[in-house]
Amino acid sequence: MMEKFIQHTGLVAPLDAANVDTDAIIPKQFLQKVTRTGFGQHLFHDWRFLDDAGQKPNPEFVLNQPCYQGASILLARENFGCGSSREHAPWALTDYGFKVVIAPSFADIFYGNAFNNQLLPVKLNDTDVNELFEWVQQNKACRFTVDLEQQKVHAGNKSYDFEIDSFRRHCMMNGLDSIGLTLQHLDAIITYEQEQPVFLR
């Protein structure tokens, strides 16, 4: 079971870049681990740091700016998460503290991997995303509320509707991964197994 996602209010970090690929999200030299934790420190490594060792933060990069410390909602441009199909990308984002990524579009594999790791990818049209970028620039350190139950993003006095597959929405709201989904049918599985001939058990 994963943490349930019903509604989240958080600080928004604007990453004004299109086609952010998974190698930018988490560079390949940091992929040795097979657990989901510890990747956040390497998120956007080549953009966040001026040196390979990660000791010199780039003051120009959005996540290094004081007003965006503790951001949990990432606002981005189209085709977020393109490139190779590494699941480490959503691992790095969630380990850093992000709960939501808002963009006009996502790479298909990243989109699926995000749901599998309880990271909500919210698709809004270009006009809405442009409005949100303008709002964030005019209101630094602002917060959005992302309501999965109502399928709305609340920013200031405006709300933006988003679509999401009902099955994925159900899984996010109930904190269900593939194991959790299976356990929902545990009684039926046990009954089926008990009905099988002894030699098949």
Curated annotation (Swiss-Prot):
It catalyses: (2R,3S)-3-isopropylmalate = (2S)-2-isopropylmalate. One of its GO terms (biological process) is L-leucine biosynthetic process. Pathway: Amino-acid biosynthesis; L-leucine biosynthesis; L-leucine from 3-methyl-2-oxobutanoate: step 2/4. InterPro entries: 3-IsopropMal_deHydase_ssu, Aconitase/3IPM_dehydase_swvl, AconitaseA/IPMdHydase_ssu_swvl, IPMI_Swivel, LeuD. It is an enzyme of class 4 (lyase). Keywords: Amino-acid biosynthesis, Branched-chain amino acid biosynthesis, Leucine biosynthesis, Lyase. GO terms for molecular function: 3-isopropylmalate dehydratase activity. It holds the Pfam family Aconitase_C. The keyword Lyase applies. GO terms for cellular component: 3-isopropylmalate dehydratase complex. Transmembrane segments: none annotated. Its EC number is 4.2.1.33. HAMAP family: LeuD_type1 (MF_01031). PANTHER family: 3-ISOPROPYLMALATE DEHYDRATASE SMALL SUBUNIT, 3-ISOPROPYLMALATE DEHYDRATASE SMALL SUBUNIT 2-RELATED-RELATED. Belongs to the LeuD family. LeuD type 1 subfamily. Heterodimer of LeuC and LeuD. Catalyzes the isomerization between 2-isopropylmalate and 3-isopropylmalate, via the formation of 2-isopropylmaleate. This is 3-isopropylmalate dehydratase small subunit.
